[in-house]
């Protein structure tokens, strides 16, 4: 599908100018044309507009369980969350709109646009995402790192429980490495 869109701009902030730009859209999603080929891209949340509503509802949840119910809206494409309540419950969730993709492909690489079976239609349910609720260790850590090392080792989600096609990151951030090197006592003392 090819169309044209007019974009009004101002040159140097003074001179009005209208630019006409070609817009290409495929069954996979928007298309970017370059000198070396055309690339369609598809990402979760590309039509999602409910983030403000979800933030609002999250702020009024009175318990981890109420918060989890709000999180089932799944309006955020990717955002790690940690929450706690007055009853001492804590939770980490690698919250994302993770596509349910066809197995057998390296989803980090370019894939053939001619194969419509590669157009994913669904995302993982909230309750199927990597999460830790009330770990025995008593703590969770979130520093933009893998969801498989967020608390004491016995309580971490098992990467083998998730398909490779989910694309969950296995890398550790520097802050996460430093945070996990501290024991709980040192971690608590560093914040007080």
How would you label these PLM feature ranges?
Residues 1-192:
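Mature extracytoplasmic enzyme cores
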